């Protein structure tokens, strides 16, 4: 029998068709989840209990993705985004959801991920939460020079794109810094070297406001004078970062930003953290203080106890732990941050604190700090602390506090702790980035008796 050609369904038509979807829940990235022809469909911008009109943009074997076109039946938790740049800027992705609902979703997602991938269940601590707007004390804005218009754009990159979205304000950035965006855009466009400028970093510290401008070639005297005048007019410290990574104050002196780590309400002597622009620091001052206070409460450091702080950075947790009287060892993989941490220990008058540089993904058996400890604090990057946890038997801490910026790696590493005889005692959300899907958490593990 002759076999005739049978045309395949036109996939482009399938992808371009607008369809109605009923959204059941959110995934951990904040996208709405619906079902369509036996597949899970992810729809960014959609909320649970909504009926939406969306357009399929990607078809895979077991799932699909769609672009939200219209909300037909809105959720009671849907709110109007406050930011005029929300739908183009890639910075925030949950402004369409009430702040209360955001936090409920994040807490539920955290518990779900821990239960599903680690089989871990512990007492859920109250979420660490604060202001929903103007909470960022630091931001890096991208620049883009248009060779045709000879204009420099200042803003954030669009989601999953290198395109720079020009902005005039940022509602999650500290108000004094947000108010500087438009004036800075005007200033930078007046410079002769505007085609040679990189990013602009804005910092609100406890000792003033700072701006760091990345340059690819030296600025002439007129440009330097304009920057110095702007700095004086707006009461901001401006420094330039050259191709070698060195920083130079526009007025000839370089002042470093300083943050306070302990809440003013504590009875403990203050602890300050001095850092160089470019070093990693937590961007939410209110939540960082609450996070440090909670870590101190959960670990309850005592004089004479040996506490190890892995991935310690410049001492965000190490310094307060030492202030409480414990003998603290901090280990960090970035040499410059170790040097800054040591300087911070001296500046705070702490002699019961030692910092080491080390690769925490390598063999740690011969490290001078490796050995029996009383308690362990982990604050790794998104990749987690899996390799470091392989040395638990040698360290034998009674308690482990794990601070995580990625619930997936936290769940994976929690499974290691459970296998080593630890029990999850407490788990809590850290809402470091309101208006975004990002989930941070703190977990307390104790060695079973």
From Swiss-Prot:
One of its GO terms (biological process) is rRNA base methylation. Keywords: 4Fe-4S, Iron, Iron-sulfur, Metal-binding, Methyltransferase, rRNA processing, S-adenosyl-L-methionine, Transferase. Gene3D superfamilies: 2.40.50.1070, Nucleic acid-binding proteins, Vaccinia Virus protein VP39. S-adenosyl-L-methionine binds at residues 282, 311, 316, 332, 359, 379. Residues 12-70 form the TRAM domain. Pfam families: TRAM (PF01938), tRNA_U5-meth_tr (PF05958). Its EC number is 2.1.1.190. [4Fe-4S] cluster binds at residues 83, 89, 92, 170. Coiled coil: none annotated. GO terms for molecular function: 4 iron, 4 sulfur cluster binding; iron ion binding; RNA binding; rRNA (uridine-C5-)-methyltransferase activity. The active site is at 405 (nucleophile). Disulfide bonds: none annotated. NCBIfam families: PRK13168.1 (NF009639), rumA (TIGR00479). Catalyzes the formation of 5-methyl-uridine at position 1939 (m5U1939) in 23S rRNA. This is 23S rRNA (uracil(1939)-C(5))-methyltransferase RlmD. It comes from Shewanella oneidensis (strain ATCC 700550 / JCM 31522 / CIP 106686 / LMG 19005 / NCIMB 14063 / MR-1).
